[in-house]
């Protein structure tokens, strides 16, 4: 089954109920949320997330494949800041509890950045952090994300991700989020040889680990290490490749999540593209008037 969705908001007063309704309005059958603002630690108690109230919408629209994105402020690779490791692991452990509570199947996590200490030092610290938080009884898998290699990010190669996975005791609780923009920006030939890239992923990590795809076009050329998403078919990867990824026979039932930018010159009145991008991908036909159609929502 083709599972397409997007990032949706989760905010008061409707919380998860609002997230499910937003996803349904886009014609999605999967979705991704942050359990709070990704740049801070403020979180509502689990009993205020309206989890039970959301269930009828989730059932009616087959939205049970929920992805939670861990907050950006968690950097398990940081070995420089005293006391930070305890903060990062405590907060990630709380996010695992929240992801389990909302019924998420995957918790996407940026592995981290070495901030000058070197990739191997950071990877060792990331393994230590994952071993500190993962419990065999948790339901959600932590889906380490492929990174663009911006700055001192680690996880820019399949080998780095495999090294992390191999070092974790309960690594059956680990999976991978494959971001098409990040992976292209990291230097992989997504546009020209996606099958070859997928075969390389299978050889290095194993396709059985691939549980989430972030389906994004890129503003920059292959190998740019920039991480700038753009709308489907409007970037350097292009519609044909992203449509191939969405419908790829080796990737059935995997959540394909759009993180493409809102549309509009006025930042206060930008519009979500997801209903239109999902429809375009389901049809398998590029819409050259995509941006105009989105702007007609006004």
From Swiss-Prot:
Family according to the record? Belongs to the AP endonuclease 2 family.
Cofactor, free-text remark: Binds 3 Zn(2+) ions.
Name its GO BP terms in alphabetical order. Answer: base-excision repair
Top enzyme class? hydrolase
Q: Which residues bind Zn(2+) 1?
A: 69, 110, 145
Q: Name one GO molecular function term.
A: DNA-(apurinic or apyrimidinic site) endonuclease activity
Q: Quote the record's binding site residues for Zn(2+) 2.
A: 145, 179, 214, 259
Q: What is this organism's lineage?
A: Bacteria, Bacillati, Bacillota, Bacilli, Lactobacillales
- List the catalytic activities from the record: Endonucleolytic cleavage to 5'-phosphooligonucleotide end-products
Annotated PANTHER family: APURINIC-APYRIMIDINIC ENDONUCLEASE, ENDONUCLEASE IV ENDODEOXYRIBONUCLEASE IV
Q: Name one Pfam family in it.
A: AP_endonuc_2
Q: Which Gene3D superfamilies match?
A: Divalent-metal-dependent TIM barrel enzymes (3.20.20.150)
Q: Which SUPFAM superfamilies match?
A: Xylose isomerase-like
Needed cofactors, names only, are: Zn(2+)
- Please list the residues that bind Zn(2+) 3: 182, 227, 229
What EC designation does it have? 3.1.21.2
- Which SMART domains has this protein been placed in? AP2Ec
Give the record's keywords alphabetically: DNA damage, DNA repair, Endonuclease, Hydrolase, Metal-binding, Nuclease, Zinc
Give the domain of life: Bacteria
* Name this polypeptide is given: Probable endonuclease 4
Function field: Endonuclease IV plays a role in DNA repair. It cleaves phosphodiester bonds at apurinic or apyrimidinic (AP) sites, generating a 3'-hydroxyl group and a 5'-terminal sugar phosphate.
Output the CDD domains linked to this UniProt entry: AP2Ec
| InterPro entries linked to this entry | AP_endonuc_2 (IPR001719), AP_endonuc_F2_Zn_BS (IPR018246), Xyl_isomerase-like_sf (IPR036237), Xyl_isomerase-like_TIM-brl (IPR013022)
């Amino acid at each position: 089954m083709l599972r397409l969705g997007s990032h949706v908001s989760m905010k008061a007063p409707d919380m998860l109920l609002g997230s499910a309704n937003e996803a349904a309005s886009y014609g999605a059958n999967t979705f991704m949320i942050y359990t709070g603002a990704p740049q801070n630690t403020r979180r509502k108690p689990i009993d205020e997330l309206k989890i039970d109230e959301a269930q009828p919408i989730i059932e009616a629209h087959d939205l049970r494949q929920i992805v939670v994105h861990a907050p950006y402020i968690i950097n398990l690779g940081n070995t420089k800041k005293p006391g930070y490791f305890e903060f990062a692991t405590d907060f990630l452990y709380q996010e695992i509890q929240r992801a389990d509570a909302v019924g998420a199947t995957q918790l996407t996590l940026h592995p981290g950045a070495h901030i000058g200490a070197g990739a191997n030092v950071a990877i060792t610290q990331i393994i230590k952090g994952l071993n500190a938080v993962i419990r065999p009884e948790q339901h959600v898998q932590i889906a380490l994300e492929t990174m663009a290699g911006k700055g001192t990010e680690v996880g820019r190669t399949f080998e780095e991700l495999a090294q992390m996975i191999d070092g974790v005791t309960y690594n059956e609780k680990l999976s991978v989020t494959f971001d098409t923009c990040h992976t292209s920006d990291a230097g992989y030939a997504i546009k020209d040889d996606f099958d070859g890239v997928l075969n390389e992923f299978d050889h290095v990590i194993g396709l059985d680990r691939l549980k989430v795809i972030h389906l994004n076009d890129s503003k920059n050329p292959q190998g740019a290490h920039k991480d700038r998403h753009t709308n489907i078919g409007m970037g350097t990867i292009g519609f044909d490749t992203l449509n191939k990824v969405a419908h790829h026979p080796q990737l059935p039932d995997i959540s394909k999540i759009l993180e493409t930018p809102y549309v509009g010159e006025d930042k206060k009145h930008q519009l979500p593209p997801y209903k239109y991008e999902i429809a375009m991908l389901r049809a398998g036909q590029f819409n050259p008037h995509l941006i105009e159609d989105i702007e007609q929502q006004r």
